[in-house]
Amino acid sequence: MSKIELNHVSFEYIDKKNQVFGALEDVSSTIEDGQFVSIIGASGCGKSTILSILAGLNRPKSGEVLINGEKVKGTGKDRSVVFQHYSLFPWMTIEKNLIFGIKQNIKNLSKKELQERASFYLEKVGLKGVEHKYPSELSGGMRQRAAIARTLAMDTDILLMDEPFGAIDARNRVLLQDLLLDILKDTKKTIVFVTHDVDEALYLSDRVLFMKNKRIEKDIKLPFERPRSREDLLGSLEYRRIRKDIVSLYYDYDRKEENVVYVEEDSYSSASPSVSGSEPYYCTALS
């Protein structure tokens, strides 16, 4: 059981010149046990800050975060994090990187069991046969997949994922999206997922939180039943309506903010449709 509660959470960063920058303002939300919740919004709106606070890496200036009614005071074995960029120990092989993570959370496994668990999750993310390679021998996308495999192998109750698929090619992104849905179906883990990709959020999530100006602007409960079919979802009028509404939130935000940082087109599939002509877009194709 892993229910998450954010109660009136605010957070500030202080730079080297001791200037204070607000990152979150009075954020409240409840994520139920077993829910997949995506957080979307323009760059700088506070998405990653929420994840770092949920992970216990930062403490809120005010308010509190509760997991199963207990106040979060730091990191914990009930949570694991996938960062935007891979976080592997360069002096360890890929297998040893996974085993290191597994041993932090699962005790009393034999050497053979540890190796089998590492190999199982590497195969799940399409990296069979790289166990004895070092991170420097893999591409950036492969390293990120290895980091995702390590997080999944740790088997925590809560997965916190900060744009985990951004550096991964379109084919493997689809593979990993479906893997996450399989894990959700089989284990009922609670997943909090930060993404810039509206289509990805709609395909994966039970709810989508749209952030704006350091707050949660919209909490959108999705009506799509599980298991989901990409083809059926893309053909759904309800899907198209919700997608249009979410994209309009981005453009409403853009018209009010001059310093918006747009998602770079090159970071997504070239098959992704632009919303209108040459305007920047935020969504990618699902396949």
Explain the meaning of each model-derived region.
Residues 63-74:
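Conserved ABC transporter NBD signature motif
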Residues 134-138, 142:
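Conserved ABC ATPase signature
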Residues 95-103, 112-115:
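Short helical segment in ABC ATPase nucleotide-binding domains corresponding to the A-loop/adjacent helical element
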Residues 110-130, 182:
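Conserved ABC ATPase "signature" region
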Residues 40-42:
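The feature captures the beta-strand-to-loop junction immediately N-terminal to the Walker
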Residues 153-157:
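A short, proline-enriched helix->beta-strand linker immediately N-terminal to the Walker B motif
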Residues 82, 148:
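Hydrophobic anchor residue at the start of the ABC signature
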Residues 55:
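Helix-to-loop junction immediately C-terminal to a conserved catalytic motif
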